[in-house]
Amino acid sequence: MEQEQDTPWIQSTGHINIQKRENGQQTLKLEHHNSIQLMDRCPKTMNRAVMLKQTVCWRQWLFLRSPTPVSLKTRVLRRWKPSSKHGWTN
């Protein structure tokens, strides 16, 4: 699951497919479907942390697909502010 978190927007394009490992852990995989089907197929027993992670991943994917001018400005300012503390170099 760790490798899948590197590119969350790619994961968020489908419905959830749950697989059980030998040790009893559940593995979540996403397959291609639209957002309504994604929400409909979420298991009712999924814990809140996993559901929150899926929601955040889906929002990141939507942002990359169709960013608004306001969200772009916010994103740029967040990235620029920490680096602006160092000042400009010639």
UniProtKB/Swiss-Prot annotation:
Recorded family membership: Belongs to the influenza viruses PB1-F2 family.
Location(s), subcellular: Host mitochondrion inner membrane; Host nucleus; Host cytoplasm, Host cytosol
Function: Plays an important role in promoting lung pathology in both primary viral infection and secondary bacterial infection. Promotes alteration of mitochondrial morphology, dissipation of mitochondrial membrane potential, and cell death. Alternatively, inhibits the production of interferon in the infected cell at the level of host mitochondrial antiviral signaling MAVS. Its level of expression differs greatly depending on which cell type is infected, in a manner that is independent of the levels of expression of other viral proteins. Monocytic cells are more affected than epithelial cells.
Matches recorded under HAMAP family: INFV_PB1F2
Region (Mitochondrial targeting sequence): 65-87
Name of the molecule in the record: Protein PB1-F2
GO cellular component terms, A-Z: host cell cytosol; host cell mitochondrial inner membrane; host cell nucleus; membrane
Gene designation: PB1
Keywords carried by this UniProt record: Apoptosis, Host cytoplasm, Host membrane, Host mitochondrion, Host mitochondrion inner membrane, Host nucleus, Host-virus interaction, Inhibition of host innate immune response by virus, Inhibition of host MAVS by virus, Inhibition of host RLR pathway by virus, Membrane, Modulation of host cell apoptosis by virus, Viral immunoevasion
Site (High pathogenicity): 66
Quaternary organization: Oligomer. Interacts with human SLC25A6/ANT3 and VDAC1. Interacts with host MAVS.
Gene Ontology terms describing biological process: symbiont-mediated perturbation of host apoptosis; symbiont-mediated suppression of host cytoplasmic pattern recognition receptor signaling pathway via inhibition of MAVS activity
Misc. comment: Is not encoded in all strains, and seems to be dispensable for replication.
